[in-house]
Regions:
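Conserved pre-motif I regulatory segment
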Residues: 1-28
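Conserved Walker A/P-loop ATP-binding site and its immediately adjacent core
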Residues: 36-41, 45-72, 150, 237-238
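Conserved interdomain linker/interface between the two RecA-like ATPase lobes of SF2 helicase motors
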Residues: 161-234, 354-355
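Conserved helicase ATPase core of P-loop NTP-dependent helicases/translocases
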Residues: 64, 76-89, 239-288
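Walker A/P-loop
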Residues: 20-43, 233, 257, 282
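Post-DEXD/H (motif II) to motif III coupling segment of the RecA-like Helicase ATP-binding lobe
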Residues: 120-182
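A conserved SF2-helicase RecA2
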Residues: 163-177, 195, 322-372, 376, ...
Length: 442
């Protein structure tokens, strides 16, 4: 299996970091960039040198995906999870972090521990317990979002951070799907309490599990993404069931999925979704991480969150590329885009334990703002734009995307968001404004 250029660069930078003496390295790369393939490739190289590698993850679906990736690069391995008897004898083991934590006393020390979804790593967590049980092992953490729920970085467990490509770079190169973001409504969260860094689930359920909000989600799905495969991210299992029921009542093939289902039932629902027999899948967190189905074209956000990591993980489920897929539609009924910014917005991650992101200066991109037109798209405010034609009375970058092509002034008038210029490419971001003050054509 051939690596993409950015994957090869990231792998080399990880190896260089270890050679420089760092014992615990964090690799940051977007959802959909092929992180599993990258660390499987690293595992293959070490396995050829008879090194012991343990790859830990926290969900059954992740264990399966990791095993599939290892098979693709011809790595012999075993799986350690609930129901597994004894300790695997292969040099490479894919382990449930919770099962491994219970068997640490008898588990042989690995040379390398690889942690998928490493934003869960904290010293006092199960992940931290496993890592600290083997002080001589090197550690490679992999994540798209190197930030804890409380906004702090992962510097207490990692020595160095290797930055992979950005979402914007991969979108520009055609490795991720461009996204259109629509925010038809923003929920009133003034009464929602906060606990442990995020909204209290019971308060969110009371706010979001309403016919008016779900009805709006169904209506906008019909208008903007009718018939496309969608994932709806919900607040609770009850909320997910209610949302699925409303989509079914509207004539769509929908189903919910949750961790309480047995393995056979969950696999059956996912198989139907993959084949298109189910159009809309509703879930409470179960598919926020490690869910790999590139054919998903729509993300319906019905779960407000203060967690940037959770928001990016959810939005990232829908931006993988797939044959015939031209774009991703994000229907944000939760206000997450306005709170956290666009999925491909540049983020300056840092490893320090104080704050995982550098604070923006006044000259950097302000928060997302709603469009003033009827389209209900979301825009990102910018401080200055130098358009190819016309002058701006106030500048905006629209989240609509159009095929790269020349557009005349009379064509611009037909758009719900008036535009000033287009960055040409397979798909370009439209630089839009409220008022175009010059009549020059493009």
């Amino acid at each position: 299996m051939k690596l993409r250029d950015y994957q090869e660069r990231a792998i080399n930078e990880v190896r260089d970091s270890f050679r420089m003496g760092n014992r615990r390295v964090l690799l940051v790369s977007p959802t959909g960039s092929g992180k599993t393939l990258m660390f499987s490739w690293i595992s293959a190289g070490m396995a050829r040198n008879e090194k012991r590698i343990t790859i830990i993850a926290h969900r059954r679906e992740l264990l399966k995906q990791i095993s599939k990736a290892l098979k693709a690069v011809n790595v012999r391995h075993s799986i350690l999870a609930g129901g597994t008897i004894g300790i695997p004898r292969t040099n490479v083991v894919v382990a449930s972090v919770f099962t491994l934590a219970k068997r640490l006393a008898k588990y042989p020390a690995p040379d390398l521990i690889i942690g998928d979804e490493a934003h869960h790593f904290t010293p006092d967590s199960t992940w931290g317990k496993v890592v600290q049980a083997f002080p001589d092992a090197r550690v490679l953490g992999v994540t798209a979002t190197p930030e804890r729920l409380d906004g702090k970085g992962l510097g207490l467990l990692f020595d160095d951070m290797v930055m992979g490509p950005t979402v914007a770079e991969l979108t520009e190169q055609g490795f991720l799907s461009p996204a259109e973001v629509y925010a038809p409504s923003k929920p009133d969260l003034t009464k929602a309490r906060t606990r442990m860094g995020d909204y209290v689930t019971a308060d969110l359920e009371e706010t979001m599990d309403k016919p008016s909000i779900t009805g709006s989600a169904v209506a906008h799905y019909r208008k903007l993404a009718d018939g496309k495969r969608a994932i709806a991210f919900c607040v609770s299992i009850k909320h997910a069931k209610d949302v699925a029921a409303d989509f079914i009542a509207a004539g769509y093939r929908a189903s919910h999925i949750d961790g309480g289902m047995d393995e056979k039932e969950r696999d059956g629902v996912l198989a139907k979704f993959e084949t298109g027999e189910i159009q809309i899948l509703t879930s409470c967190d179960l598919v926020s991480e490690g869910f790999d189905l590139p054919a998903v074209e729509v993300a319906i956000m019905l779960r407000p969150t203060k967690s940037l990591s959770l928001y990016l993980q959810q939005a990232g489920r829908a931006i993988r590329i797939s044959p015939g897929k031209e774009k991703t539609v994000i229907l944000d009924h939760a206000g997450n885009t306005q709170m956290h910014g666009f999925i491909d917005e540049p983020r300056d991650w840092v490893l320090t334990s104080e704050n995982a992101r550098k604070k923006r200066t006044d000259s950097e991109t302000p928060p997302a703002v709603p469009c003033t037109g009827r389209c209900r798209c979301v825009q990102s405010a910018v401080t200055s734009i130098r358009p190819r034609a016309g002058r701006l009375s106030s500048g905006m970058v629209s989240w609509f995307r159009y095929p790269g092509r020349t557009m005349r002034a009379w064509q611009l008038k037909r758009l719900t968001c008036r535009v000033a210029s287009i960055r040409y490419g397979m798909w370009g971001r439209v630089e839009g404004i409220n008022t175009l003050t010059s009549g020059r054509s493009m």
